């Protein structure tokens, strides 16, 4: 998948249960619209959505399962259960929360990586990180790429945005980590997307700015 998405846009097609567009059918059509617009990949949540999206478009999919656990703040592909579901979906890449926070059931990140590779050595793994330290750890653990997904969404990075100081966080990752870096999170405009690619990001994931009409509407109203 990494070869297919080089210098390209990945559109995140997700709607949680409390959102108006929550529906596997609707997400499949959102993915089709994204493909027609030029997207080269899709990021999607849940086995059901991914299966329906793959029936609609022939784009590679980054799969996640968001699920809350009482004993952890980690909710993106947090345990073996989510890995099993994503492997059943046949997505090309699986994204896993790779922050240093404690995982549900005290599962170790290395064990989750090893488990996935043991069951399917072909599936690629994306590390959703918040800090440079986490990116370096993920690289050593055997992830295929890094995504800035959680930068600004953890207690130690709150109020940070990927675009701060002309994408200084992205620049630091690119200079310190050898595996591909995917820019994701608060990329709100075509200009931001182009800047990320210009700086050297392997690809860029955009979600809310394209696929969440309620957020787009709020931005217009201010």
Swiss-Prot record:
It catalyses: an N-acyl-D-glucosamine 6-phosphate = an N-acyl-D-mannosamine 6-phosphate. Pathway: Amino-sugar metabolism; N-acetylneuraminate degradation; D-fructose 6-phosphate from N-acetylneuraminate: step 3/5. Keywords: Carbohydrate metabolism, Isomerase. Its EC number is 5.1.3.9. GO terms for molecular function: N-acylglucosamine-6-phosphate 2-epimerase activity. GO terms for biological process: carbohydrate metabolic process; N-acetylmannosamine catabolic process; N-acetylneuraminate catabolic process. It comes from the Bacteria. SUPFAM superfamilies: Ribulose-phoshate binding barrel. GO terms for cellular component: cytosol. HAMAP family: ManNAc6P_epimer. Converts N-acetylmannosamine-6-phosphate (ManNAc-6-P) to N-acetylglucosamine-6-phosphate (GlcNAc-6-P). Belongs to the NanE family. This is Putative N-acetylmannosamine-6-phosphate 2-epimerase.
